[in-house]
C-alpha cells in the first residue's frame, strides 16, 4: 500500500514538473513575442519620427515661400519693370509719391487703388474726379499741359515714380537723366491696355487689385462679344474724329478695334493710316449704316450740330442719316488708353445692335 502511495506521489510530481516546464516555455514565448512587438513598435516610431521630420522640413519650405510671396505682394521685394518703349525700371520699395503725365494713367492709378499716392496730374486729367477742385483745395498739384509738360513743376513734387506717355517723352527723358524713375505707358490695343493696368498695379504694389480689375473688364468684354455673336448682320460704321476737314479712324486704333468687337464694320478699316483724312464723297460712297461723332474735352465738338451734319452736301443720301442713326459718344472713353474702353465697347455695341441689348 505504501508503495502505491509513493508511486502516486511520484507521478503527481512528474506531472507538476511537466506542466510547470510547459508554462515556463509558454511564458518565455510570450516574453519573446513582446520583445518582437516592442522592436516593431520602435521601428514604427522611428518611421513616424522620420515622417514628422520630413513634414517639418516641408512646412519650413512653405513658410519660406509664403514669406517671400507676402514680401512681393507687399511691394517690398525688388521688382524689375519694362515699359512700352523697352525702358527698364527697378523699384526696391513701393512708391509713395506718384506723378501722372497722362489722363489714361491717372484713371488706371485710381482704378487699382493707388490714387492716394498720386501727387501731381496734368490739366487734362479729369477722371475719375474733378482734379481742378482738388488742386484748388491743395490736395493735388497740377504739373501743367499734357503735351510736353514742363519738368520744373514735376521736380518740385519730388516723385519716386512718374508715369508718362509718348506725348511727354521729352520731359520723361529729362527726368530719367536726373535720376527719377519713369515708366512710359503707351498701349496700342485693348489687350495692351489690360497689360498696362497690370504693369501699373505691379509698380505701385497693387497687383492683386489690378488683376481683379482686369478680370472684371475681361468678363464685361466677353459678355458683349458673346451677345453680338447672335447678330444677323454687320452694320457699317463711320466714326468722325475731327472736322470740318474730315478725319476718321483706321486700322491700329482703339476706335477700329472697338467697332469690330462691338459687331460692326469700320468703313475705314482698310485705310492706309491710323487716322486718315477722308473726303465727304468717300463717306457718301461707303454709305454707313451708323454714324458716331465724339464730344471732346469739356463737351466741345468740331462738327457743329446734327443740322450741320445733315446739311453736308450729299449726306442726305446716306443710310445712317435717312434712318436718323446718328450718335454722340464721349471721346475720352473711346480714345484714351484707359480702363473705360470697356464702357466704350458696351456703348458702341448697343448703338450698332440695339435689338440685342434690352
Describe the role of every protein-language-model region.
Residues 97-157, 161-167, 264-267, 295:
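A short, structured surface patch at a secondary-structure boundary
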Residues 122, 252-275, 295:
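His/Asp/Glu-enriched short active-site or ligand-binding loop at hydrolase and phosphoryl-transfer sites
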Residues 149-159, 177-178, 278-287:
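Short helices/loops that flank or line small-molecule/ion binding pockets
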Residues 168-177, 290-310:
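A ligand-binding cleft/hinge motif common to bilobed small-molecule-binding domains
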